[in-house]
Amino acid sequence: KPNTAMDMNLDVRDIGKLLGHLGQPDSVKGGTANLNGKLSWVGNPYDFTPTILTGNFRLEAIKGQFLQVSSSGAGKLLSLISLQALPRRITLDFRDVFSSGFAFDDMAGSFVIDKGLMATNDFLINGTAAIVTMEGSVNLVEENQNLRVKVIPAASDTVAIASTLLGGPVVGVVSYLLQKLLKNPFGQITAFQYAITGNWD
């Protein structure tokens, strides 16, 4: 049976325009990026499916802004990266971050894919309103995730903790919330940590 291997080094001058051509218009504004790595799968090039995909790649991007990401197709993966997949009751805590779109100065991460399971331990978004780190795995086949996310607001003293954050039924992708928040010596909240598991829906 044939095997397909691909070495890639892709420079993107406008992330937003590229995603528009790929069926995700108005999901990202501007931004430049570089994507490089190696991917392979058993079969011909046209046999490509996430279930047989293996390899590794690195993504680096600068000066872009996440807008309203579609919840269908590849938009589901984008919504994870931009944190829009977090349930509404959690994003309420970061309305200053998400209200007009999440702008980033730079974004980078290394990823390994094994038969559709994509993992990272160093994904970081340096945003103008917050710094976000993410590690864990996303299953592109079964469309679920097991991620640990830390959000560090740029102006933590202006971010209020919604009372609903710790109350009510847990819906959507969050199965466990770390209730303990990191604090600096002055008692101000400096970071929010979440464990996100479950289906994309």
Task: Place the predicted regions along the sequence by residue.
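Small-residue helix/turn framework positions
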Residues: 1-197
